[in-house]
Each structure stands twice: as C-alpha cells, then as structure tokens.
Amino acid sequence: MNYLPAPPPGTTPLRVLSIAGSDSGGGAGIQADMRTMTVLGVHACTAVTAVTIQNTLGVEGFHEIPAEIVASQIKAVVTDIGIQSAKTGMLASSSIIAAVAETWLRLELTTPLVVDPVCASMHGDPLLTGEAMDSLRDRLFPLATVVTPNLDEVRLLVGIDVVDTESQRAAAMALHALGPQWALVKGGHLRSSDRSCDLLYGGSSAGVAFHEFDAPRVQTGNDHGGGDTLAAAVSCALAHGYTVPDAVGFGKRWVTECLRDAYPLGRGHGPVSPLFQRT
C-alpha cells in the first residue's frame, strides 16, 4: 500500500493528539494509537483519560483520570507543541467528555477531530455510563470531523441493529444527524459476510453522500485494538491534509494490513500489528 510521506530527518514532523485510555496489555488505547502514529511518521502526543487494568482476556477495571487533569494535558500540548489533528478513544465519564469538549472550544481548535466512541471493550466490558453516552452525543459529536463507531457502539448510540446495507445506511444517517461532519459505520463486526464493508456518510452537502470501503475479511482472532488503529490512521491522514473520504480509505487499507500481520499474545485476543515492513 502507499504510505504517508515521512518527514525529512531532523525536521519537525506533524503532530497528532490521542485523547484516550492506557491499556496495560499494550494492545489498544493510547499504546495502539502511538504505534500507528509513530510508524506513519507523525509525532504522537497524548492526553490520558483512564488507566485500565486489562490483558488479552478482558478489562478487570480502570482508574479514571480527573477531568481537570485531562483538560490540562490537552492545553499543555496544544499551546506549546501544536497539533494538526486529534482523535479520542475511551473517555471514561461524562465529566471527562465535557472537559474535552469545553477545552476544544476554549482553545478555538479547528484541526480535524476523529471521535472513536468507545462505549465497551471488545470483550463486552462496559466503559461508559448512560449519562456519559448522552454527553458523547450532545457535546462531542457536534465537534467531530468524523465519528467511527463499530456496530455494537452504533446500537448503543442510535438504537439501530445493523444487519445489512439498508440498516447500515440508516445508522450512518442517524449518527450524522447528531452533528459530526461525517459518520463512518464500520462493518467489521458483521460476521455474516466474508467481506468487511465500512460505510461513510457526509450528508447532502458532501456531494457524494455515501462512500463504501470494502475489503476481504481477515480471518483472525487477534484483532485487539483494531478500532483504535483505524481511527489513529485516519487522524494521521487528516493531519496530512487528506479529505475525509480519502483519509478513511487510507485508514481502511492500513487496518486491513495490520489485521493480516496480527500476532498471538497471552491467552486471549492478540493485537493488530502496524509493524509490518514498509515496502
């Protein structure tokens, strides 16, 4: 696949901010974001929202970082280092979501923002309360350049069970109505097909309202961190000035390669791997 341009040695690279939780198993969250961002040649900045206790078998618990500390991390990065894009992952609580939204507005940020609405872990462990879900929809989605839920998160966010193309389109439109510029409904959890089709919707003002991104399904049980990896790659492409459809297309190709190179780890789901050779 074609990669993003690498910065010349000794020059300052583009900067992308990940606002997410830390995964003690190293498969998802901040750790997955930093791996993809680093391999793609951008400087990864972070604002940690939670410290999780997890491994390949699941999430055993987490410690929420105080909202004011999350906000201060974002401010510290933006006011000194500067960013060309950002992404969110696990935000843990309504107070953290509010702090992220308020800080974004206070700093008058206009850089692209990818919102990966992490509501539950891949093992089904809940990561957001109902109140936090409301904050996510009401406060953060309207600031997002693109939101990137999987099918389980779509069900929690807009109450639609995606079972086919028609319901996937309905879900994308319902998500878009919550305020983001674009809504991406990932089809990776729709196991009834040997294809993985993601659907991007940008509304009537986007010209071509729907964009489909289709790829052969990669058969692997080592898929931990796939959603984080996709969103991180999209953020990197947006930092380079890609349009949202082009950035999502790049992210889809990237995560497909990462799934193909995923490796076993522990006794559960191993991580996707961005460490394949760049040829």
Swiss-Prot record:
<dbReference type="InterPro" id="IPR029056">
    <property type="entry name" value="Ribokinase-like"/>
</dbReference>
<comment type="function">
    <text>Catalyzes the phosphorylation of hydroxymethylpyrimidine phosphate (HMP-P) to HMP-PP, and of HMP to HMP-P.</text>
</comment>
<protein>
    <recommendedName>
        <fullName>Hydroxymethylpyrimidine/phosphomethylpyrimidine kinase</fullName>
        <ecNumber>2.7.1.49</ecNumber>
        <ecNumber>2.7.4.7</ecNumber>
    </recommendedName>
</protein>
<dbReference type="InterPro" id="IPR013749">
    <property type="entry name" value="PM/HMP-P_kinase-1"/>
</dbReference>
<dbReference type="GO" id="GO:0009228">
    <property type="term" value="P:thiamine biosynthetic process"/>
</dbReference>
<keyword id="KW-0784">Thiamine biosynthesis</keyword>
<dbReference type="InterPro" id="IPR004399">
    <property type="entry name" value="HMP/HMP-P_kinase_dom"/>
</dbReference>
<comment type="pathway">
    <text>Cofactor biosynthesis; thiamine diphosphate biosynthesis; 4-amino-2-methyl-5-diphosphomethylpyrimidine from 5-amino-1-(5-phospho-D-ribosyl)imidazole: step 3/3.</text>
</comment>
<keyword id="KW-0067">ATP-binding</keyword>
<dbReference type="GO" id="GO:0008902">
    <property type="term" value="F:hydroxymethylpyrimidine kinase activity"/>
</dbReference>
<keyword id="KW-0547">Nucleotide-binding</keyword>
<comment type="pathway">
    <text>Cofactor biosynthesis; thiamine diphosphate biosynthesis; 4-amino-2-methyl-5-diphosphomethylpyrimidine from 5-amino-1-(5-phospho-D-ribosyl)imidazole: step 2/3.</text>
</comment>
<dbReference type="Pfam" id="PF08543">
    <property type="entry name" value="Phos_pyr_kin"/>
</dbReference>
<keyword id="KW-0808">Transferase</keyword>
<dbReference type="GO" id="GO:0005524">
    <property type="term" value="F:ATP binding"/>
</dbReference>
<comment type="similarity">
    <text>Belongs to the ThiD family.</text>
</comment>
<dbReference type="GO" id="GO:0005829">
    <property type="term" value="C:cytosol"/>
</dbReference>
<dbReference type="GO" id="GO:0009229">
    <property type="term" value="P:thiamine diphosphate biosynthetic process"/>
</dbReference>
<feature type="binding site">
    <location>
        <position position="54"/>
    </location>
    <ligand>
        <name>4-amino-5-hydroxymethyl-2-methylpyrimidine</name>
    </ligand>
</feature>
<dbReference type="GO" id="GO:0008972">
    <property type="term" value="F:phosphomethylpyrimidine kinase activity"/>
</dbReference>
<keyword id="KW-0418">Kinase</keyword>
